[in-house]
Amino acid sequence: MDFNKENINMVDAKKAKKTVVATGIGNAMEWFDFGVYAYTTAYIGANFFSPVENADIRQMLTFAALAIAFLLRPIGGVVFGIIGDKYGRKVVLTSTIILMAFSTLTIGLLPSYDQIGLWAPILLLLARVLQGFSTGGEYAGAMTYVAESSPDKRRNSLGSGLEIGTLSGYIAASIMIAVLTFFLTDEQMASFGWRIPFLLGLFLGLFGLYLRRKLEESPVFENDVATQPERDNINFLQIIRFYYIDIFVCFVAVVFFNVTNYMVTAYLPTYLEQVIKLDATTTSVLITCVMAIMIPLALMFGKLADKIGEKKVFLIGTGGLTLFSIIAFMLLHSQSFVVIVIGIFILGFFLSTYEATMPGSLPTMFYSHIRYRTLSVTFNISVSIFGGTTPLVATWLVTKTGDPLAPAYYLTAISVIGFLVITFLHLSTAGKSLKGSYPNVDNEQDRAYYAEHPKEALWWVKERKN
């Protein structure tokens, strides 16, 4: 491949930070919706599955509606991924936030089972399906856009900022539910209180749309993809044939990230209430505090990943959860409130290593002309099978085995697999250019360096297979 130093991408670090904010709003929207749903499962179950008398089965049906919706994420990933690779990242990010806001609003407006019968759970499922379809293109698009707009040397630190949106959305959901449960009676929450956060989610979506309309297309897409449209002809079968190892590593990384993520953010509140017997307000405050602490931790690990490589930070997370998952869940059963907090913090601490590294590292696994679609499909298939089903699987394991530590065994097993795959198959790309792209730099010194060292600038050429 002929090297042209004029193709080195000069990016503005300040603009890169603004892209993190604009894309992070979408993450906040997604996780605000998910957090509200997770915290209000008891009320949602009572409204949409009221004929079911058994509370455990009603809860499983409510989680099942969430899990089934995840099956639509890969379809959304295919559709939005193809559009994103062909027409640009920005158009997809604008579309997905509109669809997410609409589906969140719809859930807040739905009549209950007592009002319209079987249509109530059907409409709830359809709203979750729309949410799943739209988020199928959202997170992969946000990761791709931020990675392609950031200086290579700061890709992980800026990418970790994307997860502030994730954590902030969940924190906002947690605070709102805590406030509502404090001021409203349980009867009022079951009647109308649970709907309020879903209705307010519309305003978060509109704010995100306003910010995203101001975004420019990523420099990598403009310089390396849009100018070479003939490279889009490669199909998914060819992608799998050429890059099956990269796809496998990405799949496993998303598995251990999302099983941990959904275990802590979606299942743990229910676990603390139903197994540990903490009240809803205490649970909400605890999870909110841990999420807040995770924000600076994620930013710290993001900077660390840029210095020592994301592979080592991955191994801190997978290794830590291999050793401490069971211990953390055991601490949750302590009679001491402080010890319970420590147990939750252990899980949040190691989760923050994934929050820090995933946004900046997953997009680097694929070449520019196939990045969005391949990442989107791989990410969403993995999330659909393992992420969205985590609360359902964890609930089933406890019910089936009678062992309250069963979720910890599951988390440990996933972490062991992740540790082995990352150790033997993952290549650290921190500080390197994205595959298929010229380097992204934010100063003339780095630009001059790569101009004089083309082999380092295009390190990926020798690995390319199509």
UniProtKB/Swiss-Prot annotation:
Pfam families: MFS_1 (PF07690). It is a multi-pass membrane protein. Gene3D superfamilies: MFS general substrate transporter like domains. The chain crosses the membrane at residues 20-42, 63-83, 91-111, 116-136, 164-184, 191-211, 239-259, 285-305, 313-332, 337-354, 377-397, 405-425. GO terms for cellular component: plasma membrane. It is found in: Cell membrane. Keywords: Cell membrane, Membrane, Symport, Transmembrane, Transmembrane helix, Transport. GO terms for molecular function: symporter activity. The keyword Nucleotide-binding does not apply. Belongs to the major facilitator superfamily. Metabolite:H+ Symporter (MHS) family (TC 2.A.1.6) family. May be a proton symporter involved in the uptake of osmolytes such as proline and glycine betaine. This is Putative proline/betaine transporter. It comes from Staphylococcus aureus (strain MSSA476).
